[in-house]
Amino acid sequence: MFRGATMVNLDSKGRLAVPTRYRESLNEESQGQMVCTIDLHQPCLLLYPLPEWEIIEQKLSRLSSMNPAERRVQRLLLGHASECQMDGAGRLLIAGTLRQHAGLNKEVMLVGQFNKFELWDEQTWYQQVKDDIDAEQSTQEPLSERLQDLSL
């Protein structure tokens, strides 16, 4: 399980150093093999350990290529999926096209989201957090049943 938000730097080659607290579990779970793709709804990237990504691929394979919306999701997620291998120094090379898509520069936020990470440009991340808090404070929408049952 991945949690927390950590600022990491991309080096000049587009590599990010995975925080040490995640390296051991990633090596155990996936031998450091990861898959990175775009997020369909946010200006960030999604980074999955390979076994978790394979579950996503199975779900995508069950979608109909004859349904335009389903094919679009397949095309976007699979078409942008890029495998990356954690090297001996715990670094992952993020493909240039993916970095460009998410507007990633030097400072990047690695955000744990249960079974995956999100990769955000640092400034975009902080703006998104502010926007999310503002939306929560001003929303008039009733909470879903799942959120009503969530006790923090």
Swiss-Prot record:
It comes from the Bacteria. SUPFAM superfamilies: AbrB/MazE/MraZ-like (SSF89447). Its main location: cytoplasm. The keyword DNA-binding applies. GO terms for cellular component: cytoplasm; nucleoid. PROSITE patterns: SPOVT_ABRB. GO terms for molecular function: DNA-binding transcription factor activity; transcription cis-regulatory region binding. InterPro entries: MraZ, MraZ_C, MraZ_dom, MraZ_N, MraZ_sf, SpoVT-AbrB_dom, SpoVT-AbrB_sf. Keywords: Cytoplasm, DNA-binding, Repeat, Repressor, Transcription, Transcription regulation. GO terms for biological process: negative regulation of DNA-templated transcription initiation. The keyword DNA-binding applies. It is found in: Cytoplasm, Nucleoid. It holds the Pfam family MraZ. Residues 5-52, 81-124 form the SpoVT-AbrB domain. Negatively regulates its own expression and that of the subsequent genes in the proximal part of the division and cell wall (dcw) gene cluster. Acts by binding directly to DNA. May also regulate the expression of genes outside the dcw cluster. Belongs to the MraZ family. Forms oligomers. PANTHER family: TRANSCRIPTIONAL REGULATOR MRAZ. NCBIfam families: division/cell wall cluster transcriptional repressor MraZ. This is Transcriptional regulator MraZ. It comes from Yersinia pseudotuberculosis serotype O:1b (strain IP 31758). The gene is mraZ.
